[in-house]
Design a protein with these regions (language model features):
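An alpha-helical support segment within catalytic cores of ATP-dependent transferases
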Residues: 64-124
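Active-site Asp-x-Gly
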Residues: 135-188
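Hydrophobic HxD+1 residue recognition
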Residues: 127
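ATP-binding pocket architecture of kinase catalytic cores
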Residues: 1-74
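Extended, well-ordered alpha-helical scaffold segments
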Residues: 49-52, 97-106, 213-225
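ATP/Mg2+ or Mg2+-diphosphate-binding catalytic cores
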Residues: 202-234
């Protein structure tokens, strides 16, 4: 409905049909929104996509909280968002040694109260390239809304922060900042933090699944990140 009333400049999955399975359960078919997932090249040199993504995410984050809360989606305050990240780090640290430099960097950011003064907003919660449908530099649709909630808008920017070129990010940030109505001075700093903590989230996923290959991959990625950052604060 938000798209139909021009509140957001992108479409979302629309049900085209469904069928019951013989042994229980159902299959749901959604309409093809068109377009394709962005490539590495798109996130590097596309001249139009940064502004399109910036407008789209700002519009999503500008929606009233009630758009999500009214349909029963979870709602978290800024402090609750911070505490959820702390809990994730604590869970990982109980099982695996996180590089000390990363732990210090993240702990300092999580304890910096100025970073966690922001208005919670409707967020997608798990934006990655396969969730986006683009065509000729324009975002057509966003799918994969199973993690949607009211919370930290930086979470939706984290993947872009980690994947896009510096030039892309500069144009994206300019458009997002211009279009976003609420004041959130540190959203991009938190997005960087979220992009790094995503490795811990992957590690915890491996721990829950008892998948040694995922655990080892995540640990190696954390070690590489620690070397790249070389003790720098956020």
């Amino acid at each position: 409905q938000a798209h139909d009333h021009d509140y957001i400049p992108f479409d979302v999955p629309r049900l085209a049909g469904q069928a019951k399975l013989a042994h229980g359960g159902s299959v749901y078919v959604h309409r093809d929104p068109g377009g394709a997932a962005p490539t590495d090249e798109d996130l590097d040199t596309d001249p139009l996509l940064p502004a399109s993504l910036g407008r789209a995410l700002a519009a999503l984050h500008n929606l009233p909280e009630t758009v999500f809360s009214a349909i029963g989606l979870p709602t978290y305050t800024a402090i609750e968002c911070r505490d959820r990240n702390l809990a994730l780090l604590d869970e990982a640290a109980r099982e695996v040694t996180i590089p000390a430099a990363l732990w210090s960097r993240w702990e300092a950011a999580l304890e910096d109260v100025s970073l966690w003064r922001f208005p919670a907003a409707p967020v997608h919660g798990d934006i990655q390239e396969h969730c986006l449908s683009i065509k000729r530099g324009s975002l057509l649709a966003i799918s994969g809304w199973t993690s949607a909630h009211v919370g930290d808008p930086a979470l939706d920017i984290a993947w872009i922060q980690a994947s896009a070129s510096d030039a892309f990010l500069e144009r994206f940030r300019e458009t997002y900042g211009h279009e976003r109505r609420a004041t959130d001075l540190h959203v991009f700093t938190r997005a960087q933090l979220m992009s790094e903590i995503a490795l811990v989230r992957w590690l915890v996923h491996g721990l829950h699944a008892e998948d040694s290959s995922v655990i080892e991959e995540a640990r190696a990625m954390l070690d590489d990140l620690a070397k790249d950052l070389d003790g720098e604060p956020l």
